[in-house]
From Swiss-Prot:
PROSITE patterns for the chain: LIPASE_GDXG_HIS
Enzyme class, spelled out: hydrolase
Residue window of motif Involved in the stabilization of the negatively charged intermediate by the formation of the oxyanion hole: 72-74
GO molecular function: hydrolase activity
Gene coding for it: CXE1
Protein name as catalogued: 3-O-acetylpapaveroxine carboxylesterase CXE1
S-adenosyl-L-methionine listed as a keyword: no
GO biological process, one term: alkaloid metabolic process
Metabolic or biological pathway, per its Swiss-Prot or TrEMBL entry: Alkaloid biosynthesis
Entry keyword set: Alkaloid metabolism, Hydrolase
Family named by the database record: Belongs to the 'GDXG' lipolytic enzyme family.
Amino acid sequence: MADPYEFLMCIHNPEEDTLTRNFPIPATPLDQNTKDISLNPDRKTSLRIFRPPTKEPPVTKNKLLPIIIYFHGGGFILFNADSTMNHDFCQSIATHIPALVVSVDYRLAPENRLPAAYDDAVDALNWVKDQGLGKLNNSEVWLKEYGDFSKCFIMGCSSGANVAYHASLRAIEMDLEPAKINGLILHCPFFGSLERTESDSKVINNQDLPLAVRDVMWELALPLGSTRDHVYCNPNIDHDGSSSGNMVGLIERCFVVGFYGDPLIDRQIQLVKMLEEKGVKVETWIEQGGYHGVLCFDPMIRETFLEKLKHFILNDEFIY
């Protein structure tokens, strides 16, 4: 294929390790059912909060809304919470479930290589916790009036699903009370390794996400000097002999969505197998056709997904 940077419409500036992004990314402004909140001013991170169309807060606790902490895709290097495809996807989730969606505008690579996005995810989890405790001077009224802190979920798409996965591992070791994480939701999760899979080889020049582009994304996102067998990329690798592999089994409940038209499908199936082997209760929706990140673009497939997501979220079990 052509130069992957041309495909991405980006220029890497290696001396500063920055990226000039020329990729056209339309953004959606706020409306009455969305708002932007600063998360960490020092890190210049923020949250975009979505609520279902409504005028009055719930009257009783059993009418409160689940809280979904969401991480967008973009190979760790592109897009934001206000990017139109991410905005529309989160708004559809908030409306259909219904739920409050807290979309995290985390730091991008290579300016902020991993684990920066994971650290921002921890900030978001702690922010939700502090909202539940009422510790912040300027408490977010939507969470206070609409949010059920006993029903929180961590969700992501593509590289955002990678962030969600690592955030869920960190959440296990955090005291998040009164927030309780009920499950992990992974849409077309973005993982890799040095070893190629069959689906990698079959669709090297996949028009949506070519192999060379995926490799460049990892080169820009991983810590300098790392390979794709780093634990941030390959979930089958334990980091420095740590207990991260054992921690995976404590997730217990996960919903994985994948499509056979996605060149990453083999990795997603491997992820499901690994989770199940470690004792995680995994629900899957793996369909023929489709492509990487299809739910953010195809409203018809999204409709089917939203019904399945609603079923998963309305399960009353919570994990940690």
